[in-house]
Design a protein with these regions (language model features):
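Carbohydrate-associated surface elements
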Residues: 218, 240
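Short hydrophobic beta-strand element within catalytic cores of glycosyltransferases
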Residues: 362-365
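A conserved catalytic-core segment of Leloir-type glycosyltransferases
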Residues: 5, 41-148
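Conserved acidic donor-binding segment of nucleotide-sugar-dependent glycosyltransferases
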Residues: 378-387, 395-400
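Aromatic "clamp/platform" in nucleotide-sugar-dependent glycosyltransferases that forms part
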Residues: 345
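Conserved donor-binding/catalytic core segment of Leloir-type glycosyltransferases
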Residues: 213, 256-282, 295
Length: 435
């Protein structure tokens, strides 16, 4: 064995193809691990021009057209005998699939074979998720299994449920230890009592894993409570953040007490993020002060419903929807923001709150989040306590001494959040398994 552990990393999102928080997290950790391990990363789709130092990246979108080694086979999960197909709601990053989609997949596509041309189409699609996500997961699992014969590795590291099936197959085929990294859970995305196809893949993946790495203690508790995984093999690893975010503030806060203030929500507009609690909080804030607007940045399946609620309440002039924003526009918006709100119902980490803290923005966040653990000097409330959320926002916007104290202390917290710390924590788990 070389001085550096050899890691086979199974990923799904990676720059420049992002759909949610999984991509930035995998990129940050993989990049930081580069100086500690020899890393081979397998992705369903990758742009060859995007490279990471000390990391070998394999994009299946290139392999399907270059090799005849990968054989077609019936789509049949490793766990087919352990999973009951049900007509129910389940999540597909970054949105939820309707019941019709999962029913059609389970009744028809599981009985088909994936041909070479289908593989080429699957991994050439710009949408790396989509309604055919389970078909992509099955094809990814098959191809990773075949590729493993030509890759030298000591440990398998699988990121989130979409790669867990491949990770478990490789573990039993190679007898190499498996690490699964949990960035989000089906019980976060759909409901704590969700027991569907994705939930079963997550549970079986964690049961077969040698180490389970959730992104927070909040997620660790969810894994234990909802999935029944033993505590002794769970080791939380907090995410880092992009420290090269080029933070610039636009103007001075509190320059005028009459200036219109801006409250920001940044993220996917899905049930997991608590958007209806956001609207309720905003209404209570507007009752306390008039010179404030709420900006909702992002998109998601509940965006039309939220827009309807805003129209119904006649708040179109007070609540603004921006839609999807690229990184530069996000930075500009953060530079103009006076307070940040994250009312998530179940948030494994909450990178957007960390990004807001970088901009010296006082943050009001849900207690049901990983960010609450790494940013203890934010104002925190239960997601359903909209009275407290509104009061915290009002105080942050109107009391300069409070705002300054919160942001100064949060800057200290940020020093303990970086990808190198995360990489060293992951390396400790690797060494534990190898020794």
């Amino acid at each position: 064995m070389s001085a550096k552990p050899k890691i086979l990393t199974l990923g799904w999102e990676f720059p420049p193809l992002y759909a949610g928080g999984l991509g930035p997290a995998c990129y940050g950790l993989t990049k930081a691990l580069g100086k500690y391990v020899d890393n081979t990363l397998v992705l369903p789709r990758h742009e060859k021009k995007f490279k990471v130092r000390n990391v070998t990246i394999i994009g299946l979108n290139h392999l399907v057209s270059e090799t005849s080694k990968i054989q077609t086979r019936k789509i049949d999960s490793l766990f087919s005998k352990e999973i009951n197909w049900e007509e129910e709601l389940f999540s597909s990053y970054p949105l939820t699939l309707p019941r019709k989609a999962i029913r059609q997949w389970s009744e028809k596509e599981t009985k088909q074979q994936i041909t070479k041309s289908e593989r080429e189409n699957l991994f050439s699609e710009k949408d790396i998720y989509g309604s055919n996500i389970l078909k992509k997961v099955s094809a990814y699992t098959d191809m990773v299994r075949e590729l493993a014969d030509d890759i030298d590795f000591d440990i398998i590291h699988a990121h989130d449920w979409i790669t867990f099936s491949a990770g478990v197959q490789l573990k039993h085929y190679t007898r190499k230890p498996l690490v699964v990294h949990v960035h989000s859970l089906e019980t976060d995305r759909v409901h704590p009592q969700s027991r569907n196809r994705v939930y079963e893949i997550e549970k079986i993946g964690m049961m077969h894993a040698d180490r389970v790495l959730p992104v927070s203690n909040f997620t660790k508790r969810c894994i234990m409570n909802y999935y029944g995984i033993r505590e002794e093999k769970i080791s939380p690893v907090y995410n880092g953040y992009d420290s090269d975010f080029n933070v610039k503030r636009a103007g001075q806060k509190f320059a005028s007490s009459n200036r219109e203030k801006k409250v920001l929500f940044l993220g996917r507009i899905t049930a997991q993020k608590g958007p209806e609690y956001l609207i309720e909080t905003a209404q209570k804030l507007f009752a306390k002060m008039d010179n404030v607007k709420v900006c909702i940045a992002g998109t998601g399946d509940l965006k039309p419903h939220l827009e309807y609620l805003v129209r119904k309440s006649n708040l179109q002039d007070k609540i603004v929807f921006t839609g999807f924003l690229d990184k530069e526009r996000v930075k500009k918006l953060l530079s103009e923001t006076d307070a940040y709100i994250m009312p998530s119902v179940s948030e494994p980490f909450g990178l957007s709150a960390v990004e807001a803290a970088q901009f010296n923005i006082p943050c009001v966040i849900s207690k049901q989040s990983g960010a609450a653990e790494v940013l203890p000097n934010t104002l925190q409330a239960d997601y359903w306590d909209t009275d407290k959320m509104a009061n915290y926002l009002f105080a942050s916007l109107n009391y300069k001494s409070l705002s300054d104290t919160l942001t100064e202390k949060t800057q200290v917290n940020l020093k303990d959040i970086n990808w190198d710390i995360a990489a060293k924590a992951v390396l400790t788990n690797y060494n534990f398994l190898l020794n």
